[in-house]
Amino acid sequence: MSIDFQIDKPKSAQRIVVAMSGGVDSSVVAALAKATGAETIGITLQLYDHGAAVGRKGSCCAGKDIRDARAVAEKIGIPHYVFDYENNFKESVIDDFVSEYVAGRTPVPCIRCNQGVKFTDLLNVARELGADCLATGHYVRRLVNNDRVEMHRALDPARDQSYFLFATTKEQLDYLRFPLGGLPKPKVREMAAELGLSVAMKADSQDICFVPDGDYARIVEEKCPESGQGGDIVDMQGRVLGKHSGLIHFTVGQRRGLEIGGQKEPLYVIRLDPAKKQLVVGPRQALAVAKAEIKEVNWLVDGFDREMQVKIRSAAKPVSARFDGKELVFEKPEYGVSPGQAAVFYDGDQVLGGGWIKETTPAVFDDLAE
């Protein structure tokens, strides 16, 4: 199978840098780049090396992944280099992750990683190497429409990663290539097997790669011990219903773990108040949000003032909304919207841009005022 990397040069004069994580997706991208006849260089960033993650299936950019990337590079016959970006990753991703949780928000570290370490630091390395583009294994499409570069969702909706890439700038998108955006994952694994790549059936990486056991609260508490302090669980009128063991164990919309008995209806986490160490709970209806204030907005288009579709979680269905440059107003109340999450804007399959949710305004229901 051949892929057009959309480089306006003879194939023999092209140089492509591939971000190789050690997984099947980026390995196939490297093989596709090599097959074009372009000079292909594989680069892996060492982002962390937690002992528990090194041998764990589903980690990313730890020790075993680096070895897998090197083995693939040797198999397809391309040079491979490893750059230590552990300090950059800690400062721009892990520290931000911790501070957001401590502040009672819900972070999305994969977006910060793409925004900083991958599409800033690694992209700069590719430019310094004289590459014509940086290719990655992300499932998203880069299309050229009337000489304008656009980002579109992957053809396979189950694999689409556009939510995590909204912060990509126009300049970065112009330089990036995403060869797998039009392919289903089974086809990619099939291609890897046909090429004899050892990673053909390797497990996919996890969303939070630096949390080897899934216990993100432990990571936060290790970095910020006071974050594990307990406090009161209160209802929306401020009445104390119970105690919690630390706000870092909870997110907006959560039900499990509250351990509050004797209630007439199920209670959900409505809000976290770090200043008072209070966990505010209420009925599901209280989760309804009418609008959200958005910060750090990044546009991939020159302007858009019509109704759009918005995703406030990666797995959520897009919902209709309008954005005036500051406030995102939902057509219908949206549930479980948490400060710290990303709001990504779409027009059909095209990614318009997005931003970070700073504050939310609840929808008003008469029976919640009692």
Curated annotation (Swiss-Prot):
- Tell me, which GO biological process terms does this entry list? tRNA wobble position uridine thiolation
Query: Which positions in this protein are listed as binding ATP?
Result: A19, M20, S21, G22, G23, V24, D25, S26, L45, G137
Gene3D superfamilies in the record, alphabetically?
Answer: Adenine nucleotide alpha hydrolases-like domains (2.30.30.280), HUPs (3.40.50.620), Translation factors (2.40.30.10)
**Which Pfam families does the entry link to?**
tRNA_Me_trans, tRNA_Me_trans_C, tRNA_Me_trans_M
Give the catalysed reaction(s), semicolon-separated.
S-sulfanyl-L-cysteinyl-[protein] + uridine(34) in tRNA + AH2 + ATP = 2-thiouridine(34) in tRNA + L-cysteinyl-[protein] + A + AMP + diphosphate + H(+)
Gene Ontology molecular function, alphabetical: ATP binding; tRNA binding; tRNA-uridine 2-sulfurtransferase activity
Q: Which cysteines are joined by disulfide bonds?
A: C113-C209
Q: Which residues form the active site?
A: C113 (nucleophile), C209 (cysteine persulfide intermediate)
Query: Which spans of this chain does the record mark as coiled coil?
Result: none
SUPFAM superfamilies found in the cross-reference section? Adenine nucleotide alpha hydrolases-like
Q: Which residues belong to the signal peptide in this entry?
A: none
Per its UniProt record, what CDD domains does this chain match? MnmA_TRMU-like
Gene Ontology CC terms:
cytoplasm
Which ranges does the record mark as transmembrane? Answer: none
Where in the cell does this protein reside? Cytoplasm
**Which UniProt keyword terms apply here?**
ATP-binding, Cytoplasm, Disulfide bond, Nucleotide-binding, RNA-binding, Transferase, tRNA processing, tRNA-binding
Residue numbers for the site described as Interaction with tRNA? H138, Q341
Renumbered residue ranges of the record's region Interaction with tRNA: 159-161
Q: What is its EC number?
A: 2.8.1.13
Tell me the InterPro entries matching this sequence.
MnmA-like (IPR004506), MnmA-like_C (IPR046885), MnmA-like_central (IPR046884), MnmA-like_central_sf (IPR023382), Rossmann-like_a/b/a_fold (IPR014729)
Q: What family is it from? A: Belongs to the MnmA/TRMU family.
As for what it does, the entry says: Catalyzes the 2-thiolation of uridine at the wobble position (U34) of tRNA, leading to the formation of s(2)U34.
- List the protein's name: tRNA-specific 2-thiouridylase MnmA
Native source species:
Zymomonas mobilis subsp. mobilis (strain ATCC 31821 / ZM4 / CP4)
Gene name, Swiss-Prot/TrEMBL: mnmA
